[in-house]
Amino acid sequence: ITARKDELGFAAFTSAGMDGSSDWRFKTHLANLPIYYEYKADGIGTTDAIKGTYLNNYRQIWDLYINNATCEPTVLSTKTGDDAVAEFVSGKAAFYQNGTWAYGDVASLGDENIGMLPIYIGAEGEENQGLCTGTENYWCVNAKASEEDIKATLDFINWCVTDEVAVKAMCGTDKAMPSGEAGMGFVIPFKGAAESTNLF
């Protein structure tokens, strides 16, 4: 794609903005891949045991992103998450790294024009891995909170995934909120949850 960028009119990747609205996509989400493969290969379970076995793989995928993007690597510090979305939606880039929560940002392209791919970094067996799921994508309840607050929190979480109005707000997109605003478009992997309109 990069060799024919001018002819095609688009780059391979959106800008990898390094401001706070975008850097987490690369400093945490992308960085999870080499850490996962090291945990798996070495049977480790703590960050203290990380040796950086797949650090070069991480560097290579990062270099692929920034050297085949809509902008020069020297301007990454000025690029934002909104820039990346705009570049993808306007057809200036073929690939945009993000997760299911970003569906609403790109849905205007039409479901027939978008999809998700695994990120490959050259780790053995990764062709069988499939899509990543974020390690930070879970709900927590503070064990040090009062029993009353713990119960209220658990009741709220249960309500979010069982109540018809709440599930519609969580899973829906266009006009899914009681206010008529767009819903969150999340995919809820629980029995009985409404099917999400989120393609991802």
Predicted regions located by residue number:
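Glycine-centered hinge/linker elements that transmit conformational signals in sensory
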Residues: 2, 44-78
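Long, aromatic- and glycine/proline-rich binding clefts that accommodate carbohydrate-like moieties
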Residues: 170-200
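Short, hydrophobic alpha-helical packing/hinge segments within bilobed ligand-binding/sensory domains
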Residues: 1, 84-88, 102-105, 153, ...
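Extracytoplasmic/periplasmic solute-binding protein
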Residues: 1-47, 93
